[in-house]
Every structure is written in structure tokens, then in C-alpha cells.
């Protein structure tokens, strides 16, 4: 964010500040020190942005005249403005921390990840969430911003955790809980494969209960197609109830939209036997030695 916060905040109403706030996510890149955690961390950043955007959609921030007043009298709108300003300051502080790191870090540690570095499923979710937020943004940011990078997980978690807490406050200030949950369901209605839903549910943990719950419900609907009334095992026998999605499937970008039903009355496993009531996707998994 190259424009000083005070200049941006003083020139915009609540709706303008909010749109600038959502735009801030677009300019954050993740550095190579994130390593294998890059994909999950990127999705957590995407989900935090989507949740903030969802609140704006729920209160109709770009259409409600209360949010376009330069001097709002509504107490809830005043509170919203204060919270959005705090989020902008959060990004400004994180950017300053990154700039200090860049002064002392080795050049190799300043390389950033790109979308192409994500696995196919993660990349598809990343793009889906970005497209969703872009459709909601109806105002162009007035602030001139440049891309900048985060280089450690603690800084990222500080942002997503604090944004989540700020959105908690925004949601409490306006009676929109039911609307937010419905919007979260709509956000993932086109995500039908179990692997993508599982990744979303994990990435949303602790920062977006509505999305996590919506993903969990869709997963349960898929898993619920596999059932057994009576399962008995002896010795080292193993029984898996539900689909198995292996690491090979996740890394290979296999899209799993499961519509099959697997149902048995009784399973008796003995010795070294292994029974799967469900489907397996990918290479070795449940059946590995």
C-alpha cells in the first residue's frame, strides 16, 4: 500500500474503505520460506478475504446509502468504519514488517510463489475464491497499491486470525448470521468433489466457521452414501467405511464427484483381511502395508 493510510481513510466513506480493504488481499504474495505450507496458507488468505467480502455482500455495502455517507450517524455503521480502518492498519503493519525483513534477508529467501506452484485442486479453489470476490467488488480502489510479500507463517496467521476476529465483530453489529451462512453455501455449491471440499474445510478451520460447516455438510452427504449395519473384526482385520482419497489423488489433481452408493448388512473381518465400504481414488492408500 503505497498511499499513507491517513490519506486513504480520510478520503473515503465506509463503502470505499471496505472495498480498499478487500483489495489489500490481492497484493499479498507469499515467499519461498512457506515451503510446503504455501498452498494451505494461500487458501487461508483467500478464505479470510472471501469471508470479509461475504459480510459486505450480506449488508449490501455497495448499495445501502448508510455506507456511502461521509459522516455516518448510524452507530453500527460508525463501528463498521472503525473496524475496517483497523484491518487496513493491520495490512500496513504487516507490510512494514516484511520490508524490514527484506533489508536483511538473502536474495534467495525473497523469491515468491506463483499460482502455477499450486497443485491443480488448490489452484482451482484459489481461482474460484478470487473470482467470487471479484464479482462482488463494485467499486474501484482509489489507493495505489503495489504487490508485497509475507515471508513467515506467523505473520500470515496474525492477519487471517485478526481479520476473522474483526469480521466476528462486524457480523455481531448487523443481524445477518443466516444470510452469511446461506452465502457460504452458495460460494461452494459448484464444488462437488470430496478432495476439494476436504481441503476447503481444513483451510477454513478457525477463521470461517460458515464455510467450514458448509464444506463438512457436503462431505457428510457424500460419505453418507456408504453404510454398514453391523461390522465385526477379529485379530488384525481392518474395515474402512467411507471413501479413501489418497495423497496421490490430491497431488495429481484428480477431481472426485462421487455419486455412488455402497451399502452392506454385515461385515465380518478376520486375520489380515481388509474391507473397504466405499471407493478409493488415487494410488496406494488404505490398502498399504
Swiss-Prot record:
Cellular compartment(s): Cytoplasm
Protein biosynthesis recorded as keyword: no
InterPro entries to which the protein is assigned, alphabetical: HeLo_dom, HeLo_sf, Het-s_prion_dom
Segments of this protein annotated with the region Prion domain (PrD): 218-289
Globular domain: annotated span: 1-227
Pfam families according to UniProt: HeLo (PF14479), HET-s_218-289 (PF11558)
Function: Responsible for heterokaryon incompatibility, a process that ensures that during spontaneous, vegetative cell fusion only compatible cells from the same colony survive (non-self-recognition). Forms a prion for the non-Mendelian trait [het-s]. Interacts with het-S from incompatible cells to trigger a lethal reaction that prevents the formation of viable heterokaryons. It is unknown if the native, soluble protein has a cellular function.
Domain statement: The globular domain is dispensable for prion formation and incompatibility function. However, the het-S globular domain, but not the het-s globular domain, is essential for programmed cell death.
Protein name per the record: Heterokaryon incompatibility protein s
Source species of the chain: Podospora anserina (Pleurage anserina)
Taxonomy of the source species: Eukaryota, Fungi, Dikarya, Ascomycota, Pezizomycotina
Amino acid at each position: 500500500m503505497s498511499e499513507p493510510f491517513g490519506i486513504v481513510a480520510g478520503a473515503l466513506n465506509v463503502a470505499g474503505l471496505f472495498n480498499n480493504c478487500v483489495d489489500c488481499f490481492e497484493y499479498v504474495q507469499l515467499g519461498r520460506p512457506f515451503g510446503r505450507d504455501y498452498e494451505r496458507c494461500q487458501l487461508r488468505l483467500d478464505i479470510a478475504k472471501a469471508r470479509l467480502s461475504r459480510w459486505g455482500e450480506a449488508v449490501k455495502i455497495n448499495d445501502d446509502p448508510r455506507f456511502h455517507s461521509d459522516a455516518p450517524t448510524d452507530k453500527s455503521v460508525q463501528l463498521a468504519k472503525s473496524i475496517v480502518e483497523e484491518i487496513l492498519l493491520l495490512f500496513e503493519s504487516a507490510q512494514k514488517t516484511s520490508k524490514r525483513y527484506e533489508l536483511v534477508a538473502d536474495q534467495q529467501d525473497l523469491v515468491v510463489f506463483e499460482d502455477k506452484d499450486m497443485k491443480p485442486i488448490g489452484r482451482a479453489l484459489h481461482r474460484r475464491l478470487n473470482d467470487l470476490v471479484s464479482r462482488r467488488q463494485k467499486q474501484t480502489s482509489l489507493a495505489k497499491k503495489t504487490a508485497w510479500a509475507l515471508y513467515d507463517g506467523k505473520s500470515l496467521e496474525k492477519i487471517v486470525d485478526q481479520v476473522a476476529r474483526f469480521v466476528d465483530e462486524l457480523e455481531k453489529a448487523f443481524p445477518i448470521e443466516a444470510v452469511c451462512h446461506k452465502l457460504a453455501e452458495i460460494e461452494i455449491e459448484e464444488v462437488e468433489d470430496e478432495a476439494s471440499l476436504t481441503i476447503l474445510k481444513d483451510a477454513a478451520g478457525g477463521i470461517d466457521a460458515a464455510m467450514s460447516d458448509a464444506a463438512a455438510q457436503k462431505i457428510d452427504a457424500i460419505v453418507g452414501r456408504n453404510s454398514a449395519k453391523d461390522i465385526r473384526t477379529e485379530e488384525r482385520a481392518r474395515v474402512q467405511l467411507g471413501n479413501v482419497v489418497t495423497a496421490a489423488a490430491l497431488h495429481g489433481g484428480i477431481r472426485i464427484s462421487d455419486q455412488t452408493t455402497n451399502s452392506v448388512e454385515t461385515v465380518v473381518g478376520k486375520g489380515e483381511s481388509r474391507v473397504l465400504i466405499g471407493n478409493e481414488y488415487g494410488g496406494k492408500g488404505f490398502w498399504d502395508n
